[in-house]
């Protein structure tokens, strides 16, 4: 009986810890992070873009899933090679922010590639992108081809 009482007390004392702090959801913060991300991305500001992520962040693309700061940084190094600031036109055609979710649709034309349709979805918690997905229809631009407007 004594062992049962000790076990019960231990469960009550240690098993009933206070509820873990829930992340705050602030739509204004979500919008601010999205705005910062878009601005720094379009300027090819790698350090600025990386400020939006944490070591726990995940970026999912059709080709690969990037986990943590080093892998996500590697993705953006490649993205900046595909989307150089010189000669690239990028247009966000839709932007939606609801609670902790940001969603964008965009298109871009570079000297060598056309992003006919691209989309990203972001989950933002406590001012950081914790999850992001990207998908797009990307085709090469030939010397004789006029990019789609």
Whereabouts are the PLM-identified features?
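Sec-dependent N-terminal signal peptides
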Residues: 4-13
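Short, low-complexity N-terminal intrinsically disordered segments enriched in polar/charged residues
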Residues: 16-51, 143-149
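Hydrophobic pocket/interface hotspot
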Residues: 37, 49-50, 57, 68, ...
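Short beta-strand segments enriched in hydrophobic/aromatic residues
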Residues: 53, 106-110, 136
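A short gly/proline-enriched turn/hairpin at secondary-structure junctions
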Residues: 56-67, 81-86
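Hydrophobic/anchoring residues in structured secondary elements
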Residues: 59, 95-97, 134
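Surface-exposed, charged secondary-structure patches
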Residues: 74-115
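Short beta-strand edge/turn micro-motifs at domain boundaries
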Residues: 117-146
